[in-house]
C-alpha cells in the first residue's frame, strides 16, 4: 500500500496552492480530486485580485506560490484599484481568460516534482489515538473503499461539502453546477464532532457576447502596459481587451421585486450570504431607494463567447432571469448561456483551528479555503499555501511551524481573524482589517515574505536571488539620493517651503514630503534628468524613469555607476543600460513617503511581536491561574490559543485576564530556570 507524506483533498485554489507548497518542501504529496479536468477552475468571476485580495496574491507569489504566475499567463485586462489613493491600499486586479488560467494551473500541478494527482472522491478518514489519547490521521478512505496511508491531510472542499445549487424553486445536490457535492465527507466531519455551519453564495447568468449591443455601453480600458502579479514575470504577453459597464433600471427592479418570492433567497433566509458581494435581489431589497445598480460586463476569454455580468448574481427562475437581463441597456437581445444560481454549503467553525490551520481535534488534519468560512479565490489560495507548508513541515518531523502574523501579511491578518474570531458570514479581506496596512503593501510582499520562505526551503534560489538583486538595487538608489543634499534656504529658492530649521535635507528625505516627487527632484538637481511621469488617465498609473545626464557625456568618467537591466543592480560597465527600473524607483519612493509613519508603527509592531508571541503550552490548564472567571477559563479551554496574541483577540477575554496569564507564564518560566540551575 502506497504512503504519502501529505494528501490534499480538492483541486481548487486552496488545494492547488497547498499541494504545490507541500511538494516544494520535498513532501511526497497526493492531490486527490473528483475531476482532474476541473483543477484550477474559476467557479465564479473570471478575475484575480482586488482591494486587499491583490496583495494576498502577491504574498502567495512571494512564497513561490502559483496563483500569481498563472494569472500573468492568462491576464487580458489589468487595473490598479484605488490607484488615486496611497500605495498602502492599491489593489491590483486582472481579468483572466478562463481557459488560459486553468491551463496554466494544470501545467504546474500535473508536472510538479513530488506531486501525484488522482481522480477520486474521499468519504472518510482512518483516525487512531496516540498514547495520550489524542486522535490523529492515519489514512484517507475513498468512495471506492480504498485506503491511502498518510499522516497529514489538507481538506479544501470549497462549496462542495454537502453543497446544494438553487435556481428558483429548483434544488440540485451539487457543489458547482454540473459537479456532485461531497455528502459523505460532511457526515464524517460531524462524526468527529466538528462544529458545522451553513453559508451560501451565488453567481450571475453567463451571456452570449454576440448578442450584446456593445456600441451603446460605457467602455472600461485597462492599464497599459498591464501590471504583472508575479515578481518573476517581466511582462504580460496576452492581448488586452476592454470591459464594459451598464446599469439596471427601474423596470429591472420591478421585475425582480415581482418575483422575489420565487427566488431561492426567499427560502434560504436563515443561511447567510456574502455581505460584500450581494445578490441583485438583496440589493433591490436593501437599497429600495436606488434606481439603478452598476454591472460590469467582463469577457471570459479571448476566444470565448461567454460574458460574465458582474453585479447581478441571483437565484431567480430562468425565465425571470431572461426578462431581467433583457430589461437592461445593451442587453435587450442578450441570450443567457447558463443561468445564475445560489449554492449553499457546509463550513467548519475556524476557531477549531490553530494558526497553522491544523485542527485542534485531530492531529494531522488541516482545513483551507471556503470550508473555513471565507469567500474568494485569493483568500483560499492564501490559506492553502499556509496549510500545505505546515502539513509538509510536520510530516518531515520538523518542530517549527510556519505562521504569518498580522504585522507581516494580509494572509496573517485573515488567518488570525478566522481562528480567533470565527465567522458569522462569508469572510472577505479588506485593507481596513489590517492594523498595519502601511507596512504590508502590494509593492513589498517579496521584501516581507520571500526570505521567510527561503529560510524553510520553500522558495527557489531563482526567486531568492532576484530578491537579493532587488534589495541591492534599492539600497544603492537610496544611497545615491542620500548623497544629494540641500538646505531649507536653497529649497525656498526652488519654490519649496519647509521648516527653516537649518538642517540639510537629502533627496531621499524630500521624497517623504507630500508635495515633492521625482519631478521636483529633477528641478532641484539637474543631473537627474528625464524624470517623467506618465498618466494614461484611465488607470492613473505612474511610471518613473531616471536618467543621469553625466553618463550621457562622451567623455564621462568610467567610474560613474550605471543601471544594469540584466543583473538588476548598479555596476560600472559602460555598455549597460542606464534606465532605472520602474519597480526599484517605485519601491524607493513609496518607502520614503511612508517612512515617518512606519518608524512609529514599527515600535508598536515590535512590542506586539514580543508580547503577543509569548507561547502558551498545549493543553494548558487555565483553572490554575487565580483571578480568571469561569467564563474566561471556559473560552480559553475551548479555543486553546497558542500565544498571548491569540488569547487577547478572543471575544470576552479581558485585558486583566491577559495580564494574569502573562504574569503566571513568566513566573513559571522563572521557576523552571531556577530549578534547572
From Swiss-Prot:
Is Cytoplasm given among the entry's keywords? yes
UniProt cross-references to InterPro entries, sorted A to Z: FAD/NAD-bd_sf, GIDA_C_N, MnmG, MnmG-rel, MnmG-rel_CS, MnmG_C, MnmG_C_subdom, MnmG_C_subdom_sf
Q: Provide the assembly information.
A: Homodimer. Heterotetramer of two MnmE and two MnmG subunits.
Which Pfam family, any one, appears in the UniProt record?
A: GIDA_C_1st
Gene3D superfamilies for the chain: FAD/NAD(P)-binding domain, GidA associated domain, C-terminal subdomain
Record: residues binding NAD(+)? 273-287
Q: Which residues bind FAD?
A: 10-15
Q: Which GO terms describe its molecular function?
A: flavin adenine dinucleotide binding
Indicate whether Ribosomal protein appears among the record's keywords.
Answer: no
Q: Name one GO cellular component term.
A: cytosol
Q: What is its main location?
A: cytoplasm
The family annotation for this protein states: Belongs to the MnmG family.
Q: Kindly provide the name given to this protein in its UniProt entry.
A: tRNA uridine 5-carboxymethylaminomethyl modification enzyme MnmG
* Cofactor(s) needed: FAD
Tell me which Gene Ontology terms the entry assigns under biological process.
tRNA methylation; tRNA wobble uridine modification
Role noted for this protein? NAD-binding protein involved in the addition of a carboxymethylaminomethyl (cmnm) group at the wobble position (U34) of certain tRNAs, forming tRNA-cmnm(5)s(2)U34.
Q: Which UniProt keywords apply?
A: Cytoplasm, FAD, Flavoprotein, NAD, tRNA processing
Q: Where in the cell is it found?
A: Cytoplasm
Q: Which gene encodes it?
A: mnmG
The uppermost taxa in this organism's lineage are: Bacteria, Pseudomonadati, Pseudomonadota, Alphaproteobacteria, Rickettsiales
Amino acid at each position: 500500500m502506497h504512503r504519502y507524506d501529505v494528501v490534499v483533498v480538492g483541486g481548487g485554489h486552496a488545494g492547488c496552492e497547498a499541494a504545490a507548497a507541500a511538494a516544494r518542501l520535498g513532501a511526497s504529496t497526493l492531490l486527490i480530486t473528483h475531476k482532474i479536468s476541473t483543477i484550477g477552475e474559476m467557479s465564479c468571476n473570471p478575475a484575480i485580485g482586488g482591494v486587499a485580495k491583490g496583495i494576498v496574491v502577491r504574498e502567495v507569489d512571494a512564497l513561490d506560490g502559483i496563483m500569481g504566475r498563472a494569472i500573468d499567463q492568462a491576464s487580458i485586462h489589468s487595473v490598479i484599484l484605488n490607484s488615486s489613493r496611497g500605495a498602502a491600499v492599491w489593489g491590483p486586479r486582472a481579468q483572466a481568460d478562463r481557459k488560459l488560467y486553468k491551463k496554466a494551473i494544470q501545467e504546474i500541478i500535473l508536472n510538479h516534482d513530488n506531486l501525484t494527482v488522482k481522480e477520486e472522491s474521499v468519504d472518510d478518514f482512518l483516525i487512531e489515538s496516540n498514547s495520550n489519547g489524542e486522535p490523529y490521521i492515519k489514512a484517507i478512505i475513498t468512495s471506492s473503499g480504498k485506503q491511502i496511508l498518510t499522516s497529514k491531510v489538507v481538506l479544501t472542499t470549497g462549496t462542495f461539502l454537502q453543497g446544494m445549487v438553487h435556481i428558483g424553486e429548483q434544488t440540485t445536490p451539487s457543489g458547482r453546477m454540473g459537479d456532485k457535492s461531497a455528502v459523505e465527507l460532511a457526515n464524517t466531519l460531524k462524526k468527529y464532532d466538528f462544529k458545522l455551519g451553513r453559508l451560501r453564495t451565488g453567481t450571475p447568468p453567463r451571456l452570449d457576447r454576440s448578442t450584446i449591443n456593445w456600441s451603446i455601453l460605457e467602455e472600461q480600458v485597462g492599464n497599459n502596459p498591464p501590471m504583472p502579479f508575479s515578481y518573476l514575470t517581466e511582462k504580460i504577453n496576452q492581448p488586452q481587451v476592454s470591459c464594459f459597464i451598464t446599469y439596471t433600471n427601474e423596470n429591472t427592479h420591478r421585475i425582480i421585486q415581482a418575483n422575489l418570492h420565487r427566488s431561492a433567497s426567499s427560502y434560504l433566509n436563515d443561511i447567510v450570504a456574502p455581505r460584500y458581494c450581494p445578490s441583485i435581489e438583496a440589493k433591490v431589497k436593501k437599497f429600495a431607494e436606488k434606481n439603478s445598480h452598476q454591472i460590469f460586463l467582463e469577457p471570459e476569454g479571448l476566444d470565448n463567447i461567454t460574458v460574465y455580468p458582474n453585479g447581478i448574481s441571483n437565484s431567480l427562475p430562468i425565465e425571470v432571469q431572461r426578462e431581467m437581463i433583457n430589461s437592461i441597456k445593451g442587453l435587450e437581445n442578450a441570450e443567457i448561456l447558463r443561468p445564475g444560481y445560489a449554492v449553499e454549503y457546509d463550513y467548519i467553525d475556524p476557531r477549531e483551528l490553530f494558526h497553522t490551520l491544523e485542527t485542534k481535534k485531530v492531529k494531522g488534519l488541516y482545513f483551507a479555503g471556503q470550508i473555513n468560512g471565507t469567500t474568494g479565490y485569493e483568500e483560499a489560495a492564501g490559506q492553502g499555501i499556509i496549510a500545505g507548508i505546515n502539513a509538509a513541515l510536520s510530516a518531515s518531523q520538523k518542530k517549527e511551524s510556519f505562521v504569518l502574523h498580522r504585522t507581516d501579511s494580509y494572509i496573517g491578518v485573515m488567518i488570525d481573524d478566522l481562528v480567533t474570531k470565527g465567522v458569522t458570514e462569508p469572510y472577505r479581506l479588506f485593507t481596513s482589517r489590517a492594523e498595519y496596512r502601511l507596512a504590508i503593501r502590494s509593492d513589498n510582499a517579496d521584501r516581507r515574505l520571500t526570505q521567510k520562505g527561503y529560510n524553510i526551503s520553500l522558495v527557489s534560489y531563482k526567486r531568492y536571488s532576484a530578491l537579493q538583486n532587488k534589495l541591492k538595487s534599492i539600497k544603492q538608489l537610496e544611497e545615491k539620493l542620500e548623497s544629494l543634499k540641500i538646505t531649507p534656504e536653497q529649497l525656498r529658492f526652488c519654490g519649496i517651503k519647509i521648516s527653516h530649521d537649518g538642517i540639510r535635507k537629502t533627496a531621499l528625505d524630500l521624497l517623504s514630503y507630500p508635495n515633492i516627487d521625482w519631478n521636483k527632484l529633477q528641478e532641484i538637481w539637474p543631473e537627474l534628468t528625464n524624470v517623467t511621469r506618465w498618466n494614461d488617465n484611465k488607470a492613473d498609473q505612474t511610471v518613473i524613469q531616471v536618467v543621469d545626464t553625466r553618463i550621457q557625456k562622451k567623455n564621462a568618467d568610467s567610474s560613474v555607476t550605471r543601471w544594469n537591466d540584466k543583473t538588476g543592480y548598479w555596476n560600472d560597465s559602460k555598455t549597460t543600460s542606464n534606465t532605472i527600473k520602474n519597480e526599484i524607483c517605485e519601491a524607493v519612493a513609496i518607502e520614503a513617503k511612508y517612512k515617518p509613519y512606519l518608524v512609529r508603527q514599527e515600535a508598536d509592531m515590535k512590542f506586539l511581536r514580543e508580547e503577543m508571541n509569548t507561547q502558551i503550552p498545549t493543553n494548558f490548564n487555565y483553572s490554575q491561574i487565580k483571578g480568571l472567571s469561569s467564563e474566561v477559563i471556559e473560552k480559553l479551554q475551548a479555543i486553546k490559543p497558542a500565544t498571548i496574541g491569540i488569547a487577547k483577540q478572543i471575544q470576552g477575554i479581558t485585558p486583566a485576564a491577559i495580564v494574569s496569564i502573562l504574569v503566571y507564564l513568566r513566573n513559571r518560566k522563572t521557576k523552571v530556570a531556577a530549578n534547572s540551575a
